[in-house]
């Protein structure tokens, strides 16, 4: 979302999701984006701009355009804000689908990182997850933009204390392991 936003608005991100909120979700494009094999993988999983970058999006747009050229009545070009709205929906749909599939008893979702500041995305998550309370980590005393730093601080503390920093059921490791190294300078 950030790369698309920067290309079309000159802003580094869609502040509050206001730009995405002005667009319309393109369901056919959304389905095309969901064909990415990463989305079908079971957790734990993580990705970012290493996979979901502008060239990936542009390829999906080209593929969808080629398919639409032969179909009457379907637009073959997109308003940039419609693509942004579709990317926000992709994010919300994927999170909601994985949560329902792999953690169906979830009643509360705490969002952190940049998405926690995107009101449009937060609203889409809430709509995609009826019965689940969607809020930010801030409501629980942890600023959303500090969660990653706190996680690394926790890992450092575990290392210093000689405690395992992994969960084998999550990481796939053969057992608990002390993570990291100390290189005094």
What are these language model-derived features?
Residues 3-9, 93-173:
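Catalytic phosphate/nucleotide-handling subdomain of diverse soluble enzymes
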Residues 1-14, 178:
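Phosphate-binding/catalytic loop of phosphoryl-transfer enzymes
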Residues 1-2, 14, 20, 40, ...:
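Generic, ordered loop/turn and secondary-structure boundary motif
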Residues 45-62, 85, 138, 161-164, ...:
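Glycine/Thr-rich phosphate-binding loops that ligate phosphate moieties of nucleotide
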């Amino acid at each position: 979302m950030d790369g698309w936003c920067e290309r079309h608005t000159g802003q580094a991100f869609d502040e509050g999701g206001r730009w995405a909120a002005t667009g319309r979700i393109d369901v056919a494009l959304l389905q095309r984006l969901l064909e990415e094999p990463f989305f079908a993988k079971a957790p734990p999983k993580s990705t970012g701009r290493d996979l979901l970058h502008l060239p990936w999006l542009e390829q999906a747009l080209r593929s969808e355009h080629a398919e639409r050229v032969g179909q009457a009545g379907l637009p073959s070009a997109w308003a940039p804000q419609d693509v942004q709205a579709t990317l926000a929906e992709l994010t919300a749909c994927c999170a909601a689908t994985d949560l329902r599939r792999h953690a169906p008893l979830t009643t509360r979702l705490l969002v952190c990182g940049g998405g926690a500041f995107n009101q449009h995305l937060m609203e889409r998550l809430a709509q995609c997850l009826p019965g689940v309370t969607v809020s930010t980590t801030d409501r629980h005393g942890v600023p959303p933009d500090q969660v990653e730093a706190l996680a690394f601080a926790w890992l450092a503390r575990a290392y210093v204390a000689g405690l395992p920093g992994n969960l084998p059921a999550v990481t796939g490791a053969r057992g608990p392991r002390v993570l990291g190294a100390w290189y005094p300078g």
